[in-house]
Amino acid sequence: MMELAGKTGIITGGSSGLGFAAANVLAEAGAVVYAVSRSGRPKLEGETSHENVIHLAADVSDYKEMGELTERIGHEHGIDFLVNNAGITVKSLAQDVSDADFEKVLQVNVSSVFKLCTLCYPYLRQSPHRGRIVNITSMAAHLGFSEVVPYCTSKGAVLSMTRGLAVEWAQDGINVNSVAPGWFPSEMSRKVMDEERKQKILARMPVHCFGNPRDIGAMVKFLVSDESEYITGQDFAVDGGALSFGY
């Protein structure tokens, strides 16, 4: 089914991992997807994108560059959806995190998300469909994790931002939701876990395996489709039951 035929949108962090998979899932459903990343191309050698995925090189923390990019896409094609997926982390005990590292995580994971939402706002408001924003949060917005406190802080902020924008922009015909990934094979997850921690995580989860990145794409596709018309201000965990596990 081509549920997203006729829709155009932007996804950040689209060169690899969850963003790359989501961009392709959306494109396969008929959308034209502008996948923004620092490299402007698929990260893994030999990896190809759907023909509807257009890779663009840009730095989400460069507001001038992102302003020019959104203006060009918005004027030429319109913007029906935005997926804020780009994110970074640093692995360090909280007391050892430098001011520069803390500020960089918040700059990329929070400030740039808010800025891109506001840059896309006039085009989302004009969309013939209800405009859609999907922010990628994390289990870390709901749980505490050692050695990644700046990341946890940033994702909690994005969750609150999602709810605030959903309330404020509902009158403008824009739905704002978020998706909280659990454990997926990605460059970021490899940075924060060794093999011992990986096995402990898998043993604890109700579904004892990491997710397929396309699982995130499927949830994002639903949230930018017409099937989610009455859903806004919500956070959807795609995590193999990780957030549901009790002691």
Model-found features: residue ranges?
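Conserved glycine-rich cofactor-binding loop
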Residues: T8, S15-S16
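Substrate-binding pocket helix/loop in short-chain dehydrogenase/reductase
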Residues: L93-A94, S98-L106, S189, I201
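Alpha-helical segment proximal to the catalytic Tyr-Lys
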Residues: P122, V167-Q171, E229
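Short, small/polar-rich loop/turn modules that mediate ligand/substrate recognition or access, typified
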Residues: V83, A170, N175, I231-G233
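Short C-terminal tail/terminal secondary-structure segment
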Residues: L143, K221, T232-Y247
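Residue(s) in the substrate-gating loop at a strand-loop-helix junction
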Residues: S138
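Active-site helix of classical SDR
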Residues: C117, S154, T162
